[in-house]
Amino acid sequence: GANVAIAAKTAEPHPKLEGTIFTAAEQIERAGGRALPLTVDVRDEDAVKDALDRTAKEFGGIDIVVNNASAISLSNTPKTEMKRFDLMHQINARGTYMTSKYAIPHLERAENPHILMLSPPLDMAEKWFAPHLAYTMAKFGMSLCVLGLAGELRSRGIAVNALWPRTTIATAAVQNLLGGDALMQASRRPEIMADAAHAVFLKDAKAFTGRFLIDDTFLSEEGVTEFSKYRVTAGVPLAPDFFVPETSLAPPGALD
């Protein structure tokens, strides 16, 4: 039973993205954990600091920080409004940097502290930038935080890693914003990312840091051999996610 603070803006149901911080908290508590739902705009410096302080006070400290907040717009440069550019950078890059920054004093007191970004490997291939430059810049900003903070915090024993899915993941965002039912059927369940993240947090923070992990490859390294349980629909070819390097090969049988 983990103690989990859920810090996000969604206090009221969104017409296209189901669930709120409160429904997520209910699910955590039904599973045997303790939850602290906090309404937080990751662009707001005071709100982020307050959320971290409240979490540490409620649970007696902070062991893990997951930077998952993200804004997406898959538009090319002429079609990207500057307010959308700013939003993506404020949430993805700045939000990740700021949350990590203010978490450091709390994490320094933890026994096995981890920061995990849900962000991709830094594969500097033109094909990831040309179709949606603004989004890629913002998303890679999160990954640059991994690269820099892993080195900066290594001497303090704080691990900083990135985790990214090989395939699309069946979330409300995929359903309503990216590909509808067809893409959902070609996706994996969120549990693959949850299992991979859990495996990361069990690692020795002093030794396991600065890694850019692809979900199935990492789980395979941890001894997982059965990946069919993560599929939404058996027999439907899985849709690849953005940003997975061509050099990253799936484990044997993982995509079958």
Task: Kindly give the residue locations of the regions a language model identified.
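Conserved glycine-rich Rossmann-like NAD(P)H-binding loop of the short-chain dehydrogenase/reductase
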Residues: 2-23
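The beta1-alpha1 cofactor-binding region of Rossmann-like NAD(H)/NADP(H)-dependent oxidoreductases
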Residues: 19, 39-51, 82
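A glycine-rich helix->loop->beta "capping" turn
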Residues: 31-36, 54-67, 73, 159
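Hydrophobic positions on the long internal alpha-helix
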Residues: 51, 66, 99-103, 107, ...
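Substrate-binding pocket helix/loop in short-chain dehydrogenase/reductase
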Residues: 76-77, 81-86
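Catalytic loop of short-chain dehydrogenase/reductase
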Residues: 108-155, 164-169, 179
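C-terminal helical subdomain
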Residues: 162-163, 181-256
